[in-house]
Amino acid sequence: MKNQWFLLSLLATFLSFISCSKDDPFPTDEEDDMSFVHSVTVGDNAYVSLFKDLNVEQTSTQNSLVFAKESFLFTYGGNIYVLESMNARLYKYRVENGLLIQEKETMILPSGSLPAFLTFDSEEKAYISCVGLGKLYIINPTTMQKTGEIDLSEYAIGKESGDKNPEPGASVIRDGILYVGLAQDKSQFNPNTGAYVLLIDTKTDKPIKMISDNRATMATAYEYSGDPFIDEKGDLYIYCVGGFGYFANCTEGFLRIKKGETDFDQSYYFPIETISIPDIKGNKANYIYSKTYTGNGKLYGYFNVPGYVSNPRS
């Protein structure tokens, strides 16, 4: 297939994370030399901590901030934002003397809103995708105050039968337009077929149009997983997770919106499950979890490999 320029890499682990007792060996970084922040979920908690660089072989929960699981990290303007989805809270931190110091008050969103993604337009404006409400909240990330909201119920394809929530997920801004992936679920993890993306003018915060493509299903995956992303050419890529492999009629794959365009590129469709991947059982993966585009046509991701699935689960 044309233009399949992704280099697919199955990563067993990206970072080694262990929970250590106080007397375990643990790398001590210079306080003013922390360059990375990461989050790891263990049980019902998410542990957020800093470390120096990728030469660090292990980290510890000893100095971590603890949040509820399904908490997501975002960075902007030197600050770190933690979006706690299940508890519907947004926290803002700065790095000082090797520690995360909270700035401003915690922003509390409505119960059940399930905030899952944060996209920054400027120091005064950002968008939160509220999966549980079918809305985008507009906030000032500097003051941590809500400044508006965008109701997306009009774009729910199940609205005629009473479903007014299109489940907004991950998003990205390109050339003054916010591109928001919509899961369009019939029930949890059971999407309507097709990929749906809503385009919003960031100057007016008014929706422009919703575009769709029947080659893949479920644009983005409720929460941050490394897409949508924009490459060096300005082309925008969206991964459709296809119902996480549960439904045969819900196909996965990458779709593209080329620079200067606002519709899906009909010449491009890249499904992962059609690719033969060496050195894994069955040589096949059926969808991608988290992913990172690193430039020069290269993307790293965590793949779901059916050949390693056991019943009962191990």
Which functions belong to the PLM regions below?
Residues 1-37:
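Bacterial Sec-dependent N-terminal signal peptides
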Residues 22-109, 115-121, 125-149:
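Acidic/polar, low-complexity intrinsically disordered N-terminal segments immediately downstream
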Residues 31-37, 79-80, 125-126, 177-180, ...:
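Entry beta-strands of beta-propeller and related beta-repeat scaffolds
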Residues 41-44, 87-89, 132-135, 185-189, ...:
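Short glycine/acidic-enriched loop and turn motifs that connect beta-strands
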Residues 58-67, 101-110, 146-160, 207-215, ...:
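Beta-propeller fold detector
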Residues 66-78, 111-121, 159-170, 218-228, ...:
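Repeated scaffold domains used in trafficking and secretory/extracellular systems
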Residues 140, 192-205, 250-262, 314:
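Beta-propeller blade signature
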Residues 284-314:
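Loop/turn-rich, solvent-exposed surfaces of beta-rich toroidal or solenoidal domains
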